[in-house]
């Protein structure tokens, strides 16, 4: 059994990690940490009678001593402090769910702050399994992609060589309120979010550069990207609509299915995607349609799972030589 730790366990992604790992035949929770001590069932009452385990004050060296792999479910800028100390201490591996290792140094410091660990940033692997599977298998540090980038890149990736790069892509993304995190904000307060839909940080959102950088790597050159996220009055789930101009006429369905032909968790839809079909699962559903030289790609994921915790476990599975699909949820909540 591989020994697993979670630092920053008190948030939504921490709970989802616990739920998946408890169903994992090859993983055992060995270390849970947050900013304060207590029983895990005090933080998440739904775990009472399911998991009797203490949450400790986060300590990087203690995590490294007791674990084969540590998930960092910490805020941006905080995760790199723990990652650096763990990686320097011993051979323990790290999957970081923050943005601290996702971007190039230049783009990170543009969007966040001065990076404290450029050495590890330079060899961190971007953890989008469908794209970087072989690199992830060999990695000690994996940067788990953001939810919006996951949903967007998986939609765009099959078509990067057919899109007119001079015109670029427009991404209209909609996410449930859980994407804003557990901390209370005015926009995610019930009276603000309920029965509402609003765009936020249009064009300037931090995830725009993450998407642009990764699709540029896939395309071999930069593709102009306009990204507009929206907060929707649902708890969880995410849908992305991508619009672009094609350089030539293509059979988009054939290209999509060929690109993802061996991917268990990519599903092809004949109609525009529905969030309800993916919430509670590791699946990404994709629909595509073309007309003349225009292309529309529509994708959906669970922002807390495929966009965060189940993707992190998929990365850990590869890093620890476990079956890639181990414990990854497949059945949507539905009703």
From Swiss-Prot:
Pathway: Amino-acid biosynthesis; L-arginine biosynthesis; N(2)-acetyl-L-ornithine from L-glutamate: step 3/4
Catalytic activity: N-acetyl-L-glutamate 5-semialdehyde + phosphate + NADP(+) = N-acetyl-L-glutamyl 5-phosphate + NADPH + H(+)
Active-site residues, record numbering mapped to chain: 147
A single GO molecular function term of this UniProt record: N-acetyl-gamma-glutamyl-phosphate reductase activity
Top-level taxon in the UniProt lineage: Bacteria
Keywords in alphabetical order: Amino-acid biosynthesis, Arginine biosynthesis, Cytoplasm, NADP, Oxidoreductase
InterPro entries xref list: AGPR_AS (IPR023013), AGPR_type-1 (IPR000706), NAD(P)-bd_dom_sf (IPR036291), NAGSA_dehydrogenase (IPR050085), Semialdehyde_DH_NAD-bd (IPR000534)
Compartments (UniProt record): Cytoplasm
Keyword Methyltransferase in record: no
PANTHER family: N-ACETYL-GAMMA-GLUTAMYL-PHOSPHATE REDUCTASE, CHLOROPLASTIC-RELATED, N-ACETYL-GAMMA-GLUTAMYL-PHOSPHATE REDUCTASE, CHLOROPLASTIC-RELATED-RELATED
UniProt-recorded name of the protein: N-acetyl-gamma-glutamyl-phosphate reductase
Lineage, highest ranks first: Bacteria, Pseudomonadati, Campylobacterota, Epsilonproteobacteria, Campylobacterales
């Amino acid at each position: 059994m591989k020994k697993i730790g979670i630092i920053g366990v008190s948030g939504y992604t921490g709970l989802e990690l616990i739920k998946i790992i408890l169903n994992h035949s090859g993983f055992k929770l060995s270390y849970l940490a947050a900013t304060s001590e207590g029983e895990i069932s005090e933080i998440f009452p739904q775990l009472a009678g399911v998991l009797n385990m203490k949450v400790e004050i986060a300590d990087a060296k203690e995590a490294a001593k007791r674990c084969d792999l540590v998930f960092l479910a910490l805020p941006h800028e905080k995760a790199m402090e723990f990652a650096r100390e763990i990686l320097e201490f011993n051979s323990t591996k790290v999957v970081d769910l923050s943005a601290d290792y996702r971007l190039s140094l230049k783009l990170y410091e543009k969007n966040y702050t001065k990076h404290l660990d450029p050495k590890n940033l330079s060899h961190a692997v971007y953890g989008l399994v469908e794209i970087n599977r072989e690199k992830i298998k060999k990695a000690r540090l994996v940067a788990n992609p953001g939810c919006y980038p996951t949903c967007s890149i998986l939609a765009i990736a099959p078509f990067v060589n057919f899109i007119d790069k001079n015109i670029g892509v427009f991404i209209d993304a909609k996410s449930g309120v859980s994407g804003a995190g557990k901390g209370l904000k005015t926009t995610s307060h019930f009276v603000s979010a309920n029965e509402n839909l609003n765009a936020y940080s249009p064009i300037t959102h931090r995830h725009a550069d993450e998407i642009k950088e990764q699709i540029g790597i896939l395309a071999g050159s930069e593709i102009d990207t306009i990204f507009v996220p929206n907060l929707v009055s649902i708890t969880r789930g995410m849908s992305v609509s991508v619009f672009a101009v094609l350089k030539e006429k293509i059979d988009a369905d054939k290209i999509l299915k060929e690109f993802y032909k061996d991917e268990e968790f990519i599903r092809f839809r004949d109609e525009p995607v529905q969030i309800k079909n993916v919430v509670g699962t590791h699946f990404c559903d994709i629909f595509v349609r073309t007309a003349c030289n225009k292309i529309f790609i529509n994708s959906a994921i669970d922002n807390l799972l495929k966009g965060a915790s189940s993707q992190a476990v998929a990365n850990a599975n590869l890093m620890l030589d476990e079956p890639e699909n181990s414990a990854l949820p497949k059945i949507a909540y539905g009703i």
